[in-house]
Amino acid sequence: MLRRLLERPCTLALLVGSQLAVMMYLSLGGFRSLSALFGRDQGPTFDYSHPRDVYSNLSHLPGAPGGPPAPQGLPYCPERSPLLVGPVSVSFSPVPSLAEIVERNPRVEPGGRYRPAGCEPRSRTAIIVPHRAREHHLRLLLYHLHPFLQRQQLAYGIYVIHQAGNGTFNRAKLLNVGVREALRDEEWDCLFLHDVDLLPENDHNLYVCDPRGPRHVAVAMNKFGYSLPYPQYFGGVSALTPDQYLKMNGFPNEYWGWGGEDDDIATRVRLAGMKISRPPTSVGHYKMVKHRGDKGNEENPHRFDLLVRTQNSWTQDGMNSLTYQLLARELGPLYTNITADIGTDPRGPRAPSGPRYPPGSSQAFRQEMLQRRPPARPGPPPTANHTALRGSH
C-alpha cells in the first residue's frame, strides 16, 4: 500500500513542492538559522580572516624530495600533525599550470602518491575525483590539495575518474568506478569521494575515515553560507572505509544528470544500518569554485522517481550492478587518471555496455574485497578528526 502511495503523481508533486520550498527558504538566507535549529556543533574557534598560505610548513617535512623509501619500523605519525596551520587561503586566480603544481610538490610520486618519510602514517587515503571538462577546476584542486594532505602526514593517492564521451554526466557511477579501480592498486584504509570544485579551507579537517560510520566532510560550504543545508545532506566531500562502502552497495548507478544521488546515498547509509558522522562546522569549511552550468549535466528529471524507490533498489543498484569499460589508466605526476566508458542513460538511445564488475553477486564481490584486506596493523588505529568526530547525526 505504501509503495503504491509513493508512486502516485500527487506524492511526487508533493516531494517536488517540498524541495522547492526548502530551496526558496535557503536562498533567502535561512542557512544559519537552520543550522541553529538543528543544533550543529560549531566546534573550536578559528580565525578565517587571517588564513595561512596553503604551502606553509612544507619545508619542515622530513626527508629529501625523491629520496630513498622510508625504512621499516618507524614510529606512528602523531595523531595531530605538528605541521597543521588551521585556516588556509583559497584563491581561484590565476589558475596554476600543471608544471607549476609539479614544481611546488617535489615529494609527490607518479600517480599522485605521497607517503611521509619520517613516520608511519595512521591512514592510507585514496582521494577519488569524478571529472569531465573541468580542467581549470582540477588544476586548482591539485594545487591546493597536495600540500594540504602532506601537512596531515597521511599516505595518500589521488585518482581522477574521467567520463569518456559526451553523454549525460553520472557522478555517482564514476565514484563507483573510482573505488573499484583504486582498490585494485592498494588496500586503502579510507576512500575520500571528492567533487572537483570544492577546496578545503582548514587543514584540521583530517582526511581520515571514522570507523563508526560514513563521514560527511563538507559540512560548511560558502555556497550554503558555511552551514549544513539540511540534516541528511551528504554532498560534496564524503569519506567511507572500503567495508562501509561495500556494506551499502556503493553508490547508485542510475542517476544521470544533476541532483538526487546525494539523498539516495544518505538513505543507503541508514538502510545499511549505519549513521553519518561529521566534523564540527568550524572545521569542515570549503569554498566552491564558481562555474556555469555544465553541458551534459542538466537537472535529472527522474530523480524523484528514483528516490522513492531507493528502499527497494539499493541492494540491486550499486557496486554489484556496475558496468563500465576501462579505456585508460595513466600514472601522471600529480594523479592517476582513469578514463572509463560508463555508457549512457538507459532512457536514451543506448544502454551501458562493457564488462561487469564483479562477475558474481554482491556477496561474492564483497567477499573478494574483504579477502584483500590486510591483517590489522599493530599499534594505534587510524584516528579521525582530532577535534573529535563529535557524535553521530
Swiss-Prot record:
Its EC number is 2.4.1.-, 2.4.1.38, 2.4.1.90, 2.4.1.275. It is an enzyme of class 2 (transferase). Disulfide bonds join C77-C119, C190-C209. Residues 32-393 are lumenal. UDP-alpha-D-galactose binds at residues 130-134, 169-171, 196-197, 226, 258, 291-293. Glycans are attached at N57, N166, N337, N385. It comes from the Eukaryota. It is found in: Golgi apparatus, Golgi stack membrane. N-acetyl-D-glucosamine binds at G260, E261, D262, D263, R303. One of its GO terms (molecular function) is metal ion binding. Mn(2+) binds at D197, H291. GO terms for cellular component: cytosol; Golgi cisterna membrane; Golgi membrane. Responsible for the synthesis of complex-type N-linked oligosaccharides in many glycoproteins as well as the carbohydrate moieties of glycolipids. This is Beta-1,4-galactosyltransferase 3. It comes from Pongo abelii (Sumatran orangutan). The gene is B4GALT3.
